[in-house]
């Protein structure tokens, strides 16, 4: 199931070899980022590097790496072919948000979400069942240049307050969180500034991050 796959990827991503143990987290991003502040407050050891390439070079083998947007919404994060080679050779697990390019593939088209809601495509936990809804208010997203199979979160105009009551059949969707490949998980928008961007409802946003960090 996608649920089990997400648990495994995110736990490795965030270096949570034990859910009861605070670990070192390799990061590219801004220390004032909401996610960075949350991890710091929770006692994680943040290793923040000035470039994507250096973060990947310094990461231990099989480590998790966070590549967070420094320039949202002006510019996305860039991952070149040399970086991809490092990820593969070191078996890294990478979360990257607001992509500008991955290798030779570019994300050039942006869109601002207006009436769309964020829909959970597969049950994550008791607060985030399949078809449950979140609101990423007026977030700016990068439209993927290629089709995405089995996205974890999508943006869509749906009926319902807490859940998409009619599902997603015949409804246009835009991928928000999805796997680019087995080593790289992409967010089409800046998820890490969840507080500043007022992602709602808070309880579900909190449940999403608790699931990511403590899902084992």
Question: What kind of region is each of these model predictions?
Answer:
Residues 1-3:
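N-terminal secretory signal peptides that target proteins for export/translocation
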Residues 6-15:
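Sec-dependent N-terminal signal peptides
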Residues 16-24:
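Bacterial Sec-dependent signal peptides at the C-terminal "C-region" and cleavage site
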Residues 23-106:
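Helical hinge/lid and interdomain linker segments adjacent to catalytic or ligand-binding clefts
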Residues 72-150:
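A glycine-rich, often tryptophan-bearing local segment used as a flexible ligand/cofactor-contacting loop or short
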Residues 106-108, 196-200:
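A short, polar/proline- and glycine-enriched secondary-structure boundary/capping micro-motif
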Residues 114-198:
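Catalytic beta-strand/loop cores that center a nucleophilic Ser/Cys/Thr
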Residues 204-216:
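An acidic-aromatic substrate-binding cleft motif
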């Amino acid at each position: 199931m996608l649920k089990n796959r997400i648990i495994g990827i995110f736990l490795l991503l965030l270096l949570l070899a034990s859910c009861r143990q605070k670990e070192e987290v390799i990061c590219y991003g801004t220390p004032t980022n909401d996610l960075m502040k949350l991890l710091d407050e929770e006692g994680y050891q943040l290793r923040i590097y000035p470039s994507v390439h250096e973060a990947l070079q310094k990461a231990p083998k099989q480590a998790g790496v966070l590549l967070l947007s420094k320039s949202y919404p002006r510019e996305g994060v860039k991952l070149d072919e040399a970086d991809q080679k490092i990820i593969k050779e070191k078996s890294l697990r990478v979360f990257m948000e607001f992509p500008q390019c991955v290798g030779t593939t570019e994300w050039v088209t942006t869109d601002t979400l207006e009436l769309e809601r964020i829909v959970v495509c597969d049950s994550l936990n008791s607060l985030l069942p399949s078809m449950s809804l979140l609101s990423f208010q007026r977030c700016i997203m990068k439209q993927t240049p290629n089709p995405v199979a089995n996205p974890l979160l999508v943006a869509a105009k749906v009926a319902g307050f807490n859940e998409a009551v009619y599902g997603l059949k015949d409804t246009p969707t835009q991928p928000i969180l999805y796997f680019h490949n087995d080593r790289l998980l992409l967010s089409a928008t800046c998820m890490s500034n969840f507080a500043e961007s007022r992602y709602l409802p808070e309880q579900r946003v909190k449940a999403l991050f608790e699931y990511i960090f403590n899902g084992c």
